[in-house]
Amino acid sequence: MAVNIYDTANQLEQELRQTKEFKELKVAYDTMKTNDSAFSLFKDFQEVQMQLSQKQMNGEELTDDEVQKAHDLADKVGNVDEIKSLMGKERNLNQLMNDLNQIITKPVQALYQN
């Protein structure tokens, strides 16, 4: 019997949506979106993170001003309860996904350990 791994992945995607971690993240995100200033700050923070990450991937040096701007924005984000809650829920979901990744990659790990 042939296994269609993409069917399995699609099933996993559907089941992930039903986990406590994902549902809590969605509630936290929806709650944050109701606070216009928190949502705007969150979007700004995401944009800065993406820009800095892109520069690093391109091998470009970050300027002191860019690093300072990121730190200042992170400080502001850390003072908003809705965003702090969202980030906590993101960590929980990320832990679940890391656990799943370890399970999924077991065959590759076993291959290289022998």
UniProtKB/Swiss-Prot annotation:
<dbReference type="InterPro" id="IPR010368">
    <property type="entry name" value="Com_YlbF"/>
</dbReference>
<dbReference type="Pfam" id="PF06133">
    <property type="entry name" value="Com_YlbF"/>
</dbReference>
<comment type="similarity">
    <text>Belongs to the UPF0342 family.</text>
</comment>
<protein>
    <recommendedName>
        <fullName>UPF0342 protein lp_1415</fullName>
    </recommendedName>
</protein>
<dbReference type="InterPro" id="IPR023378">
    <property type="entry name" value="YheA/YmcA-like_dom_sf"/>
</dbReference>
